[in-house]
Amino acid sequence: MMSKLYGKVPNNRFAQLKNEIADYEELKAEIPTGVEDYERINFQKKKILNYVNATEDNYNDYHWQLKTRFTNSKGLSELIALTEHETSTLDEVASKYRFAISPYYLSLIEPGNANCGIKKQSIPSASELDDLGELDPMDEKGHSIHDIITRRYPDRLIIKITNVCGMFCRFCQRRRLIGE
């Protein structure tokens, strides 16, 4: 009796699972794994190193990465092919919110791809100038027991030891505090 039950369930379950991933199976050959990007990233890295007149040793030094962050549009339009509109928007947003991207993260951006996830995470866009949202959507200030300590949950704390970051991500909920 058990063998009959086990014999049927896996076949039915297998068919069900296979059906659920059918769309993935059709597209999986087109999904980049990251290996394909190696040459592009390496090309971008060399382009950046040439632009800032640096070496591979510099590039592998995190101190150099922090010191050499891009904090405005200067150079970015050449390195990642920003349009004139993107360049002026970047400068406008950067005048209101701090902006920085390390050479490493810059090398990951796919030039010319408006939907590049790294670009969206790191390069300011016009939508940041909309003031429709709240400045503190997570009510960090209301949950802060001190300027540098936020306690939203009884069993954990967020301790903000610095207001400096290697890259000011565009989605960061604390960007209103950066530089204070």
In which residue ranges do the predicted regions lie?
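N-terminal pre-triad scaffold of radical SAM enzymes
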Residues: 99-101, 145-173
